[in-house]
A protein has these predicted regions:
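Alpha-helical scaffold segments that form or flank carboxylate-/histidine-based iron centers
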Residues: 44-52, 78-92, 124, 165-171
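Conserved alpha-helical segments that form or flank metal/cofactor-binding pockets of metalloenzymes
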Residues: 61, 83-116
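Short acidic alpha-helix initiation/capping motifs at coil-to-helix transition points
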Residues: 40-41, 58-64, 94-99, 143-151
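Short amphipathic alpha-helical segments and their helix-coil junctions
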Residues: 61-75, 118-121, 151-159
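Secretory/endomembrane lumenal or extracellular ectodomains immediately following the signal peptide
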Residues: 3-81, 107
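Acidic/histidine-rich alpha-helical segments that form the ligand environment
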Residues: 131-171
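Helix N-cap / loop-to-helix initiation motif
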Residues: 77-78, 110-114, 162-163
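Acidic/His metal-coordination segments adjacent to aromatic residues that form catalytic metal sites
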Residues: 120-129
Length: 171
C-alpha cells in the first residue's frame, strides 16, 4: 500500500516546528489538526501527505520550497506544460494523490477543461498542441520507461523549449 497509510501522522500538539503549524493552517485552516480531526485538503484529498511529512520538519520544508520554486514566475517552463507533465506522471504511476492535486492546479489556472479531461488518453485526443503532446510523451518516458527518451521526442522538445525549460520540466 501507499507509504502515507503505513507511517504515523503527526498531530499538531506533538510538534513545535513552525513549518508544520504554518502548513497545517494554510492547507486545512487555522488551528485545524488534520492528524486528529481527519481533515481533508481544500481539494478533497486526505491530509496524510502533510501529516506524515511532518515527521521530519526539514523534509516538509524542503517539499514546500519545491512548491515555491514551481510557482516562481521566473521559471523557464510554461506552468501549464509543467502541470500537464506532473498530472500525467501521477496518472501513469498510479498516484491518485499526485494526479488529483495537479488536476486541481490545472483547473485553478483556468486550463481548457477538455485538456484536463483528455489527459488520461492524450494519445487519442486532438485537444493538445505539438509541444503539449511531446511533454506528455516525455512524462510517460520518465514515469514508465525508466527515463529513456527517444531522440525523436527529444528533438521535438528542443524545437519548442530551451535547455533550461527542459531541465525544469525534468526536475
Amino acid at each position: 500500500g501507499p507509504l502515507m497509510a503505513r507511517v504515523r501522522s503527526v498531530a499538531r500538539a506533538e510538534t513545535d516546528a513552525p513549518i508544520v503549524h504554518a502548513m497545517y493552517d494554510l492547507i486545512f485552516g487555522k488551528g485545524v489538526d488534520p492528524a486528529v480531526d481527519g481533515a481533508r485538503t481544500t481539494t478533497g484529498s486526505p491530509g496524510d501527505w502533510w501529516t506524515t511529512h511532518a515527521l521530519s520538519p526539514a523534509v516538509l520544508e524542503h517539499s514546500v520550497q519545491g512548491f515555491v520554486l514551481y510557482r516562481d514566475p521566473n521559471r523557464a517552463i510554461d506552468p501549464e506544460l509543467r502541470e500537464l507533465a506532473q498530472a500525467r506522471v501521477g496518472w501513469s504511476s498510479g498516484s491518485t494523490f499526485v494526479y488529483s492535486q495537479h488536476v486541481q492546479s490545472m483547473r485553478g489556472m483556468g486550463m481548457d477543461p477538455r485538456k484536463i479531461a483528455d489527459l488520461t488518453a492524450w494519445h487519442t485526443s486532438d485537444a493538445y498542441t505539438t509541444i503539449e503532446r511531446a511533454v506528455m510523451a516525455y512524462a510517460d518516458a520518465i514515469a514508465l520507461d525508466g527515463g529513456r527518451v527517444s531522440d525523436e521526442l527529444f528533438t521535438v522538445l528542443k524545437d519548442h523549449l530551451t535547455d533550461e525549460a527542459i531541465l525544469e520540466l525534468t526536475y
